[in-house]
Regions:
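PAPS-dependent sulfotransferase catalytic domain
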Residues: 1-56, 106-118
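PAPS-dependent sulfation machinery
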Residues: 1-15, 28, 62-88
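Conserved aromatic-histidine-acidic binding/catalytic patches
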Residues: 10-18, 35, 61-64, 96, ...
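PAPS-dependent sulfotransferases, especially Golgi type II membrane carbohydrate sulfotransferases
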Residues: 77-125, 131-217
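Cytochrome P450 catalytic domain signature, combining two hallmark sequence patches
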Residues: 55-61, 148-152
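A polyampholytic, Gly/Pro-enriched intrinsically disordered region
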Residues: 57-69, 172-180
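Short C-terminal domain-edge/linker segments immediately following a structured domain
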Residues: 44-48, 67-72, 154-159
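SIR2/sirtuin NAD+-dependent deacylase catalytic core
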Residues: 55-58, 66, 100, 104-107
Length: 217
């Protein structure tokens, strides 16, 4: 029951994508009870752009996609783009993906910067590129905040995900990610080398303007 949940002081986990730009209700409702972990990643990856491009194609066509849609000139668009529909509608699926990544990043940055001074919530921003190389740096901070310690279960999960890694893409094989563009490097590459390789791939299917936008992010 709810009373038992509250009495035992349980931790309620809630995870979703692209949340920071729309997270105000969480901060307003929970305030000092909220532990907000913002995992961010360099968007210069063909996996991320390809994955989001597929969703951009689905939004407006499939009403089961789980996203609130708005109607404009007899067509449906995801609510994220409500203020820039004419611009958004002219883009290819991959360019729409980059458009939304920029929108979420900038709006999310603005919101979180405001919330840090307005609310007493615990906010931890975690760069994915740093997490896979130095996981305990962040795990220990989270564990301390919720009053626990990293144990053998934690270590087992890290091992299953091959963390810490020798390179960014040195992850265990996953068909879902593979089908959307992820490829494990055949040799150990630096973060800069991996990003440059991915940038060249992405440049083959987006405009110069979209690529420059991705560079800025």
């Amino acid at each position: 029951s709810l009373n038992k949940f509250i009495k035992e002081n349980r931790v309620m986990h809630y995870m979703t994508h692209s949340m920071s730009a729309y997270s105000k209700p969480l901060f307003e409702t929970l305030n000092e009870r909220l532990i907000y972990l913002r995992l961010v990643r360099n968007p210069m990856t063909d996996y991320m752009v390809n994955h989001l491009a597929k969703w951009c194609e689905r939004w407006g066509k499939d009403f089961r996609s789980g996203v609130t849609l708005i109607k404009f000139e007899e067509k449906y668009f995801p609510f994220f783009a409500k203020d820039k529909i004419p611009e958004y509608s002219e883009l290819s699926p991959h360019e729409k993906a980059i458009f939304l990544l920029k929108l979420w990043q900038e709006k999310g940055d603005h919101q979180i910067d405001q919330f840090k001074s307005k609310y007493n919530s615990f906010i931890l921003e975690i760069p994915f590129e740093s997490l896979v190389f130095q996981p305990m740096k962040y795990i220990n901070k989270i564990a301390e905040e919720i009053g626990v310690t990293a144990d053998k279960v934690t270590k087992k999960q890290l091992k299953l995900q091959n963390v810490p890694r020798k390179s960014l893409s040195d992850a265990p094989f996953n068909k879902y990610y593979f089908d959307r563009g992820w490829r494990k490097s055949k040799k150990i590459l630096s973060l800069e080398e991996e990003i440059e390789i991915l940038r060249k791939k992405i440049s083959n299917y987006v405009s110069v303007d979209s690529l420059e936008c991705l560079d800025e992010l």
